[in-house]
Swiss-Prot record:
Annotated organism of origin: Medicago truncatula
A Pfam short name: Ion_trans
Described function: Cyclic nucleotide-gated channel involved in the establishment of both rhizobial and mycorrhizal associations. Required for full activation of nuclear-localized Ca(2+) oscillations by Nod and Myc factors. Simultaneous activation of the K(+)-permeable channel DMI1 and the Ca(2+) channel CNGC15 can give rise to sustained Ca(2+) oscillations. May function during fertilization in both female and male gametophytic Ca(2+) signaling.
Protein name as it appears in the record: Protein CNGC15c
Domain of life of the organism encoding this protein: Eukaryota
Family: Belongs to the cyclic nucleotide-gated cation channel (TC 1.A.1.5) family.
Assembly, per entry: Interacts (via N-terminus) with DMI1 (via c-terminus). The Nod factor has no effect on this interaction, implying that the complex is maintained after activation.
Compartments it resides in: Nucleus membrane
Record-linked PROSITE patterns: CNMP_BINDING_3, IQ
Domain IQ per the UniProt entry, residue ranges: 616-644
High-level lineage: Eukaryota, Viridiplantae, Streptophyta, Embryophyta, Tracheophyta
Stretches for region Disordered: 1-23, 676-703
Amino acid sequence: MGFDNPRSERFEDDPEISKIPTTSGVKVKYHIDGTQIPEQSSKKSRKNETRNKFLKTRVLSRVFSEDYERVKKRVLVLDPRGQLIHRWNKIFLVACLVSLFVDPLFFYLPVVREEVCIDIGKTLEVILTVVRSFGDLFYIVQICMKFRTAYVAPSSKVFGRGELVLTYSKIALRYFSKGFWLDFIAALPLPQVLIWIIIPTLRGSTMANTKNVLRFFIIFQYIPRLYLIFPLSSQIVKATGVVTETAWAGAAYNLMLYMLASHILGACWYLLSIERQEACWKSVCNMEKSNCQYGFFNCHSIKDAPRVAWFIASNVTNLCSPNAGFYPFGIYADAMTSKVTSSPFFNKYFYCLWWGLRNLSSLGQGLLTSTFIGEIMVAIVVATLGLVLFALLIGNMQTYLQSITVRLEEWRVKRTDTEQWMHHRQLPPELRESIRKYNQYKWVATRGVEEEDLLKGLPLDLRREIKRHLCLELVRGVPLFDQMDERMLDAICERLKPALCTEGTYLVREGDPVNEMLFIIRGHLDSYTTNGGRDGFFNSCRIGPGDFCGEELLTWALDPRPSVILPSSTRTVKAFSEVEAFALIAEDLKFVASQFRRLHSKQLRHKFRFYSHQWRTWAACFIQAAWRRHKKRKEAAELRAKENLVAASEAENEIAKKYGKGFVVYGTRVARSTRKGVNMHSGTNSGVVSSLQKPTEPDFSDE
């Protein structure tokens, strides 16, 4: 085969011709040694040129579905999996539902007049004609769309990816063999032709049969229109997974189908009521055979003299009353009693709709039939249809509505199981209350949605984008990470997991191994230390949104040769309020530190020291100890100066009294030198407050 585009285009070339090498459209022959022999026959050369031009102008017949975008402007054929077809299917589904609602309204065209005749409502006739004609346009457009919609070749599905057939003739032949005639019948304007062409040509007694003709044509076309909804819904479900996007829309859709069935049943009951009323008139007419004709029940003849004379002399109005007992109206007695057949359109429509809905819901239990077989069959259909449709409605409504409350019910069941387990294990009331509080807060925060399970079902690229959107600003808010490159931040974000804490929960206690770093989203934590339980030592701080804790793990992870044993916490961290955070476990932090060597940068030393609570505590204690040492040394120096001054004055006085002034000067010098030596030996033994042990210095050097 010859290929213009090896991936997206396919031509049905002659295999033998495609194997012959050509140069500028001329066949090329070669000697045994490889030298070229030009073609001698100009006639054959022209023949080959013509053949090659023909091959280049061949119509594109097939294309792989993923390559359709490249050739769609050239072939003018629609992709059955494209967005345009999906959007049109939804529009056409709505148009089909509207048409199914409009067609039964033609049953309301016959109207019973007070003159005991049947007429056609002209205003309703015009309105229904316009609406029905507009709806028929969608069926015509659907036929045109199918003539221009490619299909997947069945033989190509074996190889895993289907090829779209783009040849117009093949598409048309396939459509003619599958579904065209059904679409054609559904698109025919049968009711319009019936009420504007056929019925006006009828005269006399044939007008009485208008109801039968109308009922036959409407039902004849209604069945294929109703059938078209099911494959159309299947196509939408196959393309998008669901017909409706939300559970409430799905429940409303099923309820609408149930109301549509009530609408159809009410319209049929109205038309059959008129037929039963006309049957009563005919029964009276048979009794008055010499003066009555069936043509008198046509409102076109109410001004005829024989008809006027018959109406004056006849007792048809009294005999055909439901209370007269002359004729068994059966299930249609309500229409006669309420005068539905002669009421304005909206009055009779809503009454008939209510009749259909009431009997469908009650499975026809309130229907009191006569002995007419046709009437009994109608009652059987109502009961059977009501049973099936009501069961479908309840089932579908339950399915859609349960999708809303299923997580709530699961949470309630889980809460019940938790209560039973706590009772079985005889947990103390305080512990039970803490468990209840945590479960309640988890439900409020997540609504039963397991975020990690949702993310696991998504592709890696989408997971990365979602984590980046949720966590990037939070991670950047940590000063220790704000200067890292994007790849490093993405690696950290990918490994963050959501965490929840209720008020009073201890995240970690002093001396326990640190398993994770926490990045706070909302809420506050209390972090404090007693320096291993030392008397008189207490240091605390408040951690809020944007802060982090568990920095001991960072020192452990930054070590090129970290120990298997996790570091111990130097602080106790307790939830001051309900806290939502992201957690980075030890193994993930170790992986990030080992993969990205830029984390081992000396530029991070000062940031790590400044924002680490452990280093802050050590620095504060170190400064306090240094200040205390300085203060004590200063006080000791002042005290020694005073003591020296007093001792010197006393010694001078004693020497002066005993030996004179010369010995005073010499004694003073000896005393000063002696005290100076004593001070030099005793100055280093002054009391010093031992400082807090210095934290382990992280190794930022590259391996």
